Structures are given as C-alpha cells and as structure tokens.
C-alpha cells in the first residue's frame, strides 16, 4: 500500500498516541499506545460524530489508505480514539475539528455501546451535530467528503466498503429516533 510521507508520519504518531484503555464495563484501566492496544486485543474508547446539514443529509467521508483500521473505506461519522486524559465529549469536539474543520457546534450525546471485532474493540459514544458551513478536510486522514441523504448512504453500504463500527453507530442512532 502506498501513501505519502506526510501520511506515514501521521500514522506513526497516531500509533504511538496514548489512548484510554478500558475494561468490558468501560472502566478506565490506564493509558496505552494505540498500536499496542490493537496488537494485544485490548479495549479502547471511541467517538462517533454523525454530522448532518439542516436538510438532514449526512456527511460521509472516505478514509485515507494510511489508516490502520479500514483504510480507504467510507465512513458515516467523524471521530476517533479517546485520549487517556480526555472525556468522550472532549474527544468528539477535538476529532470533529481535526477531521472536518468543524468547531463551535452543538454536540448532542446519544448512547454508548460496545463494538467487538478482532483488531477493533471499543466502547463507542455516539454524538450528532448539524453543520451547514464549509468542511476543511484533514489530508492525512480524509480523502473526500460529501453530504448525502441517509437513505442513499444505506443503499451505498450494499456495494461500497463502509466502516462497520460507524455504521453500527448510525444504525443505533436511527433506531432511537
């Protein structure tokens, strides 16, 4: 897999980042490097921010090929791993600004759930926001982004690769409406 030196450096820094390590009940156990957490099959915390525009369309974005998990997949949520020293809400605000350039927007907290797949074991916190402003994409993590109707997103999941963890977050959000 080929990616830029900038993406490679970003990936190395991301793998070394100290993130929250938790147990099956979401109790904080300590801090651990992201790559080590994955390698050892431990559980972390993740945030999933569903960004809608005022027309109700959902922002989907394509992940870069340098991502450790689901490279090149489409994603229905901004978000990422919760750092060791931050809350779910702090992580959501940070990730939303980093990935899409969205800041100073009301984040609405929804449910938390446990996602368990080999190499991706997370307590997930779902948030939503409404944003009609411009998007500023983080080139080391996001290749492209667009707003599309939720029904179209669900159709696309039948023939395009979408991240299963963020899809689980979206489905739980939709079921709660």
Residue ranges and their predicted role:
Residues 2-5, 33-35, 84, 109-114, ...:
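Nudix hydrolase/Nudix homology domain
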Residues 13, 75-76, 137-141:
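Short glycine-enriched loop/turn motifs at secondary-structure junctions
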Residues 40-42, 69-73, 148-149:
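A short, polar/proline- and glycine-enriched secondary-structure boundary/capping micro-motif
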Residues 28-31, 56-62, 134-138:
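Short, well-ordered strand-loop elements centered on a beta-strand within folded domains, enriched
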Residues 59-60, 77-109:
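The catalytic Nudix box helix
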Residues 3-48, 54:
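Acidic, metal-coordinating catalytic segment for phosphate/diphosphate chemistry
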Residues 46-78:
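A glycine-rich, hydrophobic loop/mini-helix early in the fold
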